[in-house]
């Protein structure tokens, strides 16, 4: 398996996302809602309602960055991006070891991106 790790977002873009994703009255849902059979057994997190204006706005920013990133284009040749999700884990929550489904409701998912908005010392797990 190949991995590409690099800085996709600049500090200003990260701050924009953090500001939008920490608005008080956002609709966070049980992460199991979009998990496949295996993943649902180990998924204990929250994800932002993908139909919300904030989710669509933030997804648009990230999708534009991915599709215009020279390194990503040379590594993966993405044609389109679908299924952008924003997740968070509160105290005691985690997403255990799993494999993402190759087919999701919006199409085939050959690539997966994880974009962290905080420094790595703020996270545990996910290795």
Role assignments for model-derived ranges:
Residues 1-78, 83:
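Non-heme Fe(II)/2-oxoglutarate
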Residues 70-127:
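Catalytic core of non-heme Fe(II) oxygenases with the double-stranded beta-helix
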């Amino acid at each position: 398996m190949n991995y590409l790790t690099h800085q996709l977002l600049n500090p200003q873009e990260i701050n924009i996302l953090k500001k939008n994703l920490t608005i008080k009255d956002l609709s966070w849902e049980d992460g199991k809602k979009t998990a496949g059979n295996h993943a649902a057994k180990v998924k204990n997190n929250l994800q932002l309602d993908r139909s919300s204006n904030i989710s669509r706005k933030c997804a648009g920013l990230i999708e534009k960055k991915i599709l215009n990133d020279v390194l990503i284009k040379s590594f993966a040749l993405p044609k389109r991006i679908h299924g952008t999700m924003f997740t968070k884990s509160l105290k005691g929550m985690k997403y255990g070891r799993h494999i993402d489904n190759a087919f999701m409701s919006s199409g085939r998912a050959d690539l997966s991106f994880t974009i962290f908005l905080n420094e790595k010392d703020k996270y545990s797990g996910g290795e």
